[in-house]
Regions:
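Canonical Radical SAM [4Fe-4S] cluster-binding loop centered on the CxxxCxxC motif
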Residues: 20-55
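Conserved alpha-helical substructure of the radical SAM core
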Residues: 46-73
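Conserved SAM/AdoMet-binding glycine-rich loop
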Residues: 66-191
Length: 193
């Protein structure tokens, strides 16, 4: 649900509804996007990046743990940009959020929603590999394996970089589950692409 009067404010991101019989809760920690991929309307429909403060997210995580939830999935329209909207003096990152959730008693598993390849750095992967509650499952947006198409899509990575990021995850996490999404038939894409 989007209320246009709230677009651009943290209030646009609502706490999720949860039911007692479930063990997995989805927590939306971020909304909006600043990427402006050529095929995507999200920056226009949802606005720019807005992140929930860690303290606010933690209130929800603690409440979920108290209700018996064992697993949380941190989600967002552009999860990798979590925190980029905060002023420098109030900087919070996705990694700092993950670490905070990891400390919550009762939460046994943490998953992440879809990530952009750019967030997968050696430091990021080493850090999450050191957190036993992190599930080794990552959805990395690919969209196309063709660099020309990626450029036309206004994606900010190329296929070799994407493969390198997958390699980093495998290096530090052994055999993680990797999933992706691919757009087929993008305008001007050829059979060779």
């Amino acid at each position: 649900e989007i209320r246009l009067s709230l677009v651009g404010s943290e209030m646009c991101i609502r706490d999720s509804d949860h039911t007692a019989e479930h063990v997995r809760a989805y927590i939306k920690v971020q909304d909006g996007c600043n990427q402006f991929c050529t095929y995507c309307i999200i920056p226009y429909a949802r606005g720019r990046v807005r992140s929930r403060k860690i303290a606010h997210v933690m209130d929800e995580v603690h409440a979920l743990a108290a209700k018996g939830y064992k697993e949380v999935v941190l989600t967002g329209i552009h999860l990798s940009s979590y925190g980029v909207d905060f002023p420098a003096e109030e900087k919070e990152t996705l990694l700092s959020l993950i670490r905070a959730v990891h400390e919550v008693e009762g939460i046994e598993r943490i998953r992440l929603g879809s990530l952009e390849p750019g967030i997968i750095t050696e430091e990021f992967v080493q850090s999450i590999a050191a957190l036993p509650k992190m599930c080794p499952h990552f959805h990395l947006s690919l969209q196309s394996g063709c660099d020309t198409t990626l450029e036309r899509m206004n994606r900010r990575y190329r296929s070799a970089e994407y493969a390198e990021k997958c390699g980093l995850l495998r290096k530090y996490l052994g055999n993680p589950a990797l999933t992706t999404d691919v757009i087929v038939g993008f305008p001007m894409e050829t059979e060779e692409d």
